[in-house]
């Protein structure tokens, strides 16, 4: 034993001095740690406000990501296990009472941060969006697995737009708001760009969100409601259409709109499936464009070294399937027409085409009435909808889908409304000259070529279509306008065809199908004459289709319905780009 080591106990004063020295040393260490944390936060984290220039904001966030990587942290984790979706969380725990916090429940959610506020350095509130619903996340240092400095440092780095994963327990705050009280908290995918600010007093917040037992439902717009895109958080049309993901993120009505589009398509499929129609798929590229009057897109097949046309319609293929024995077929898919773009036309659009053996255009009018009136009633709860037909600055009109729909005979109505006579032999040169004179008389513009088909189409648009607000069938088109339709039984020169117009726009085109191969070849020959006159929308001769008809097409009715225009009506949309997720846009 070393006699130089003293074993005498320290005096009380010495103990006090030693205790004070340790406390002072600990305090200095805490100050240093806090200073280091503060410097790290200033160096690596973005400021809480969004006042920075967007370019600087992006640069700062990129530095933050790189800093995390240098620290050995993956800023984009591979996996986060969630126990339920946010809508399921709301449904399951909406019954909790104010101030009730069942801490024994361990669950996890994930979603996008759409708002954030700090009550103090130890308490943060987030609004988490996912699955069309939003819920509050309450992050408290008390529930955290790290100390207060680390907690504050981490929370300061979480920004609006970040996708986060939260594990915790449910509860209702003192204000009665359902929340998840966070324990572990992880950023799964940072949002590097500055998001538009949500206007807390906007129409979106005050009238487009509903409160249910203290929970805010976000995507609460329903079909039949009016819309006003001017009230959106993100309002610039170009940005909304070019960056649809941002539009969906910021504007809950837009998400609800596209859910409605999906419901429309689902309703059509269910309706037709219940009638024992078979859904099929047909080629999008072929040597001919298909059965419609439109200008096609052209592409080149390298392997075959041949020019191919992108389909304007699947009509001829579908009728070949009826020849083959599929008595009821339909196709829901994309069509392409290399023509102009405006508020109701897109070069890429969605159609439903169906063909029904042993049916005629009268049967299809009944089917169309049942389908559309039933759909409107199912989606909106009424046969009547309101629609801003004349723009958002004017009062909406009412459109009534109550069956039966009105029927108008095309030529009889045209003669009556315009007080003119229409020659019955419309294939003659004299008839063409007469229609040119009529168009000039009423100042009806018809760009060349002045084929009889185009002249009639312009006159019908000028005198009849403009008055078709409620669903209206325009029926019995001339043969010269309908190369694939069967002649009318009682009136030679006319066909068993109808167009359905709603709000002055064509929604459906249907007819009793021409199944006589000899007559079909003659009709194609008439179309060739129009093409030689410069009408590039006239149909080409399709020999393979004529051959199919020679094997025998049963009496058949066919219908085409525009999904985009139908969706416009049921979502109060005035621009077709509103209802197409990624619409065609002009080059910037």
From Swiss-Prot:
From the UniProt record, which GO molecular function terms apply? Answer: ATP binding; lysine-tRNA ligase activity; tRNA binding
Q: Where is this region: Disordered?
A: 1-54
Instruction: Give GO terms for biological process.
Output: lysyl-tRNA aminoacylation
Name its cellular compartments: Cytoplasm
Q: Where is the composition biased (Basic and acidic residues)?
A: 20-47
A Pfam family that the UniProt record links to this protein: tRNA_anti-codon
According to UniProt, the name of this protein is Lysine--tRNA ligase
Taxonomic source organism: Solanum lycopersicum
């Amino acid at each position: 034993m070393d006699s130089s080591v003293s074993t005498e106990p320290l005096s009380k004063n010495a103990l006090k001095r030693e205790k004070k020295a340790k406390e002072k040393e600990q305090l200095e260490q805490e100050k240093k740690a806090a200073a280091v944390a503060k410097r790290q936060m200033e160096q690596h984290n973005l400021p809480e406000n969004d006042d920075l220039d967007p370019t600087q904001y992006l640069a700062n966030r990129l530095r933050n990501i790189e800093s995390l990587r240098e620290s050995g942290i993956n800023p984009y984790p591979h996996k986060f296990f969630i126990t339920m979706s946010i809508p399921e969380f709301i449904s399951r725990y909406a019954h909790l009472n104010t101030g009730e916090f069942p801490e024994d429940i361990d669950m996890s959610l994930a979603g996008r941060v759409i708002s954030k506020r700090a009550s103090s350095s130890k308490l943060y509130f987030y609004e988490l969006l996912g699955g069309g619903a939003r819920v509050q996340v309450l992050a408290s240092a008390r529930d955290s697995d790290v100390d207060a400095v680390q907690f504050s440092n981490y929370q300061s780095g979480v920004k609006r737009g970040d996708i986060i994963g939260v594990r915790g327990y449910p509860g209702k705050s003192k204000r009665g708001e359902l929340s998840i009280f966070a324990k572990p908290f992880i950023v799964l995918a940072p949002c590097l760009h500055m998001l538009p600010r949500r206007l807390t007093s906007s129409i979106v917040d005050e009238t487009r969100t509903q409160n249910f037992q203290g929970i805010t439902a976000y995507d609460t717009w329903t079909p039949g409601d009016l819309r006003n895109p001017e009230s959106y958080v993100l309002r610039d049309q170009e940005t909304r259409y070019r960056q649809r993901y941002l539009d969906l993120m910021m504007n809950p009505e837009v998400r609800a709109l596209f859910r409605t589009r999906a419901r429309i398509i689902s309703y059509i499929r269910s309706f037709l499936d219940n009638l024992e129609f078979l859904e099929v798929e047909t080629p999008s590229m072929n040597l001919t464009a298909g059965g419609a009057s439109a200008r096609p897109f052209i592409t080149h097949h390298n392997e075959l070294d041949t020019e191919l046309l992108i389909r304007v319609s699947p009509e001829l293929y579908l009728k070949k399937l009826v020849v083959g024995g599929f008595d009821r077929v339909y196709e829901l898919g994309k069509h392409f027409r290399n023509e102009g773009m405006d508020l109701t036309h897109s070069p890429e659009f969605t159609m439903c085409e169906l063909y029904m053996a042993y049916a005629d255009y009268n049967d299809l009018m009944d089917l169309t009435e049942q389908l559309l009136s039933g759909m409107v009633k199912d989606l909106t709860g009424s046969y009547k909808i309101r629609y801003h037909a004349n723009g958002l600055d004017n009062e909406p009109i009412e459109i009534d889908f109550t069956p039966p729909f009105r029927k108008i005979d095309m030529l009889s109505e045209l003669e009556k409304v315009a007080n003119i006579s229409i020659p019955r032999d419309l294939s003659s040169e004299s008839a063409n000259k007469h229609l040119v004179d009529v168009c000039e008389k009423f100042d009806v513009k018809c760009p060349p070529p002045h084929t009889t088909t185009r002249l009639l189409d312009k006159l019908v648009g000028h005198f009849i279509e403009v008055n078709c607000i409620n669903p209206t069938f325009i029926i019995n088109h001339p043969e010269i306008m309908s190369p694939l339709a069967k002649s009318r039984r009682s009136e030679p020169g006319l066909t068993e065809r109808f167009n359905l117009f709603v709000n002055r726009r064509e929604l459906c085109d249907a007819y009793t199908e021409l199944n006589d191969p000899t007559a079909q070849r003659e009709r194609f020959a008439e179309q060739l004459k129009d093409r030689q006159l410069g009408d590039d929308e006239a149909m080409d001769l399709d020999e393979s289709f004529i051959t199919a008809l020679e094997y025998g097409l049963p009496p058949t009715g066919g219908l085409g319905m525009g999904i985009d225009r139908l969706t416009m009506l049921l979502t109060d949309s005035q621009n077709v780009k509103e209802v197409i997720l990624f619409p065609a846009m002009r080059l910037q």
